[in-house]
Amino acid sequence: MFNLLKPKGASKRRKIVGRGPGSGLGKTSGRGQKGQKARNTSPRLGFEGGQTPLYRRLPRKGFSNNDYKLEYTIVNLGDIDKKFKDGQVVNYDTLLENKLIRKKNKKIKILSNGELTKKVSLEVSKISKSAESLVIRIGGTIKLV
């Protein structure tokens, strides 16, 4: 265990530059002769040498409404069936306790994937039509919060 060897090429030696002509990387340190790339810094990304760059030549277009987009945490009826008992209330807190959702989003949407065999009362933000009909057919209740 303690005398294992690294595979060949696993650790590469650091390039030591500017230490004389015998090293192979002396004098100009592998940077060639004069010019911008031989100096200390290179221009930032998108810089086109003083020419007006592409991102400024093209017009701005469109808008984004993502700041106001409503996102729902999706929970399937099959998961509810596995984690909840008959007659239990399914809401944000109980879903959090049963680790079916994470803390970040309080808006919950129920979808009809999986089988539901238990009467549960749902207190959620949204529910699909197929899931709603399944819950009502079994005898559960739905309250939109």
UniProtKB/Swiss-Prot annotation:
GO terms for molecular function: rRNA binding; structural constituent of ribosome. Keywords: Ribonucleoprotein, Ribosomal protein, RNA-binding, rRNA-binding. Residues 19-33 have a biased composition (Gly residues). Gene3D superfamilies: 3.100.10.10. InterPro entries: Ribosomal_uL15, Ribosomal_uL15/eL18, Ribosomal_uL15/eL18_sf, Ribosomal_uL15_bac-type, Ribosomal_uL15_CS. One of its GO terms (cellular component) is cytosolic large ribosomal subunit. Binds to the 23S rRNA. Part of the 50S ribosomal subunit. This is Large ribosomal subunit protein uL15. It comes from Borrelia garinii subsp. bavariensis (strain ATCC BAA-2496 / DSM 23469 / PBi). The lineage of its organism: Bacteria, Pseudomonadati, Spirochaetota, Spirochaetia, Spirochaetales.
